[in-house]
Regions:
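N-terminal loops that bind phosphate or other acidic moieties
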Residues: 1-183
C-alpha cells in the first residue's frame, strides 16, 4: 500500500477527504507490525483476525472499520485450521464481502470497496466450485476485482463522502474499490 499511497490519496482528494492512501499505508504498516508480534505457529485465522482488529484500531475514516470487519469475518471462517483450502478461501472471501456490505450498509453499484470485493469473491467461488486450482481461482478473482473497480468510474456514488458529489462523482474511480483491487 505504501507504493500506491499517492495514487490512492489523489483519487480520494477528488471524491472524499484525500486521506485514503495515507490511511491504507498506515493501516497496513500497523498490520505488518502486529503480524510480526504473533507466534510463528499462529494459524491463518488468528493472523487474519489480528490484521482485521489492527485495521479497525489504526485506520481513521471508513476504510479501517470496513476492511477490518472484512478481515475479521474472513478470519472467523478460517477458524483454527492450520491450513485453508480453496473451498475455505472461497467461504472466507464471501464472508468478508457480506460483512463489509453489512457494516457499510452498501451494495454492489454504490461505488464502494464492495464493487471490487463482491465480484472477486463470487468469481473465486465459481472457479473453486468448478475444481480450479488455487492459482486459477486467484486469477479470475483478480480479473473480477479489476473489472469491478473499473466499473465504478461511470457510477454515481451512493455511499461515503463521495455521496455529496452526486453526478460529479461520475467519471472517477472509487478509491476504496481501487485499494481493494490492489490488495
Amino acid at each position: 500500500m505504501r507504493r500506491h499511497r499517492a495514487y490512492l490519496t489523489g483519487l480520494d482528494a477528488v471524491l472524499g477527504d484525500g486521506d485514503h492512501g495515507d490511511n491504507m499505508a498506515i493501516g497496513f504498516r500497523a498490520v505488518s507490525e502486529v503480524i510480526e508480534d504473533l507466534p510463528p505457529d499462529a494459524t491463518p485465522g488468528v493472523v487474519i483476525r489480528a490484521a482485521g482488529h489492527r485495521l479497525v484500531a489504526a485506520v481513521g475514516g471508513a476504510s479501517g472499520p470496513l476492511y477490518g470487519t472484512a478481515f475479521i469475518a474472513a478470519g472467523h471462517v478460517a477458524g483454527d485450521a492450520r491450513m485453508v483450502g480453496v473451498e475455505t478461501l472461497a467461504s472466507m472471501l464471501d464472508s468478508a464481502a457480506t460483512a463489509l456490505a453489512r457494516r457499510g450498509r452498501c451494495a454492489v453499484g454504490d461505488k464502494t470497496i464492495l464493487d471490487a470485493l463482491r465480484p472477486a469473491a463470487d468469481a473465486f467461488a465459481a472457479a473453486a466450485t468448478k475444481g480450479s486450482p488455487l492459482q486459477g481461482c486467484v486469477a479470475v478473482a483478480v480479473t473480477a476485482a479489476r473489472d469491478g473497480m473499473l466499473g465504478t468510474r461511470p457510477l454515481i456514488a451512493r455511499r461515503g463522502l463521495a455521496l455529496r458529489m452526486g453526478t460529479r462523482s461520475i467519471g472517477h474511480l472509487d478509491p476504496g474499490a481501487v485499494s481493494c483491487y490492489l490488495l
